[in-house]
UniProtKB/Swiss-Prot annotation:
Keywords: Hydrolase, Iron, Metal-binding, Protein biosynthesis
Species in which this protein is naturally found: Polynucleobacter necessarius subsp. necessarius (strain STIR1)
Lineage of the species this protein comes from: Bacteria, Pseudomonadati, Pseudomonadota, Betaproteobacteria, Burkholderiales
TM regions (residue ranges): none
Record-listed Fe cation binding positions: 92, 134, 138
EC number: 3.5.1.88
NCBIfam families in alphabetical order: pept_deformyl, PRK00150.1-3
Name the UniProt record assigns to this protein: Peptide deformylase
Keyword Protein transport attached: no
Cofactor binding note of this UniProt entry: Binds 1 Fe(2+) ion.
Catalytic activity: N-terminal N-formyl-L-methionyl-[peptide] + H2O = N-terminal L-methionyl-[peptide] + formate
Family matches, as InterPro entries: Peptide_deformylase, Peptide_deformylase_sf
Underlying gene: def
Any single biological process term in GO: translation
Amino acid sequence: MALLTVLCYPDSRLHKVAKPVAQVDARIKKIVADMADTMYEAPGVGLAATQVDIHERIVVIDVSDEQNELMVFINPEIVWTSSETKSWREGCLSVPEFYDEVERPAEIRVKALDIDGKEFEIEADGSLAVCLQHELDHLQGKVFVEYLSIFKRTRISQKMKKRAKELIGQR
C-alpha cells in the first residue's frame, strides 16, 4: 500500500466539501487501505479523505490503544446528537503539533457504509464520538481550528505558513 501526503492547514484544499462515494469498488478499497497506512504511519487516530486531497466521503478511524481496530466509514452522516456537550483536547494530522479544547456533542449516532458497501449505524461516545465528529467536519471542509478564536486561528495559520516556508527552504 502507499503512504499518502497529508495536506497541512491553511491549505485551501482542506476546505473543499467531499462528494459522496457512488460505489464501493476496488478503487475505493485501495484508497481506504492507503488512508489506513497513512494514518497508522503518522501516527494518528483518524483520517478523512479530504486531508489527503481525495474529495470523497471516506473516513478511517482507530481509537484503540493497540491501534488494531480499524473502522471504515464511507458516506458517513450524523443522524443524531445528544444535547449534552463535552470539551476535548483535539489535535489533527493537518495541523501538526497544535492542540486545543473543542466542545462537541457528547454522544452521536452515525450512519455509513462499510468497506463492503453495507449500510450500518453506530452510536458513539468518548474519544470515538470526538474523532468521528472531527473527521466528518473535514468532509464538510472544516478544520478543528475553526472552532477556536480568530486570534488563535490566525496565530496557528501564521506558524503553519512559516513552517511550510522552512520546509521548502530545506529542500
